C-alpha cells in the first residue's frame, strides 16, 4: 500500500465553522493561512458557486474567492470513494470529531454504513435527511463545528489531483487487505451502466446488453451497481481477474480489485477516459480501452449520441 503514496506529501488540515451542502460541495474556511491546494478540480470551475453563496452568519465562511476550499460530496460513487471519503477518514483520524452526515447517501449505497463505522465514532455522528431545520443551518445546508481532512500539499492543481487519487487507492487497497480473505482472482466481471428511471436519458452505450450476451459465452458475470450492495460489489471485484465496463460511476469499483488484473473501459474517444485510466495506471492494472462508434458508421460517436462497441472484446 505504501507504494501508492510514495513521494507525495499530505497535511492534515483542521477546519472550523464548516457548512456542508448535501449532494453538492463542502465549503471550508481554513484556520490557517497556508496556501495548500485542496484541489479535486481547479478553483475556476466554482467561481459562480462561490459568488452566489450566502449563509446566515457572516462569520461562518469567507466568501472571498481565494480563501475557500472545497471537495466534492456528491453521492456519485466516484466522487465519494475517490475525492471525499478517504480524505476525510483515512487512518482513523476523526474518531472524536463531530460531523453531520446526510443519511440519504448511506441509504443509497447499502453497506457503506458498515465501512464508515470502522473509521468514525458514531456516537458523535448526527444523521439528517435532505430537508434540515436547525439553528444556524439554512435549508439543505449542514453546519459542523470542526472537521479534519487530508489535503495534498502540492501547489500544482493537476499534481494535487493525482495525489488525491493515490491516497484514495492506498486507502481502499488497505481496506480490502484488512477486511477480505486473500484470494487468487478468478472471476470475469462486466459492469454495466444503469438505465433505470431518470437515468435512462444518461444511457451511453447503445448495445451494452448485446455486449454482455457475448461476454457471457466467455464466462463473464454481470455487476449492476444498482442491484447489489456495496460489499457484494467489492467482493466481486476483489475476486476478479478481468473487468470490462461501460464508462460511468460504476467503474469506480475497480478500486476494490487486485493490482495487475485486466481492465477494459468502454467509452467515448474523449477526455472522459482519463478518469478511470488514471486510477488503473496508479493500480498498475493491465489497462485497455474500446472507443464507441456511431450505430451505422465506423467513425467515433460524439457525446451527444449513443456509442456502440463493435467487434470482439
Residue ranges and their predicted role:
Residues 1-313:
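The feature primarily captures lumenal catalytic ectodomains
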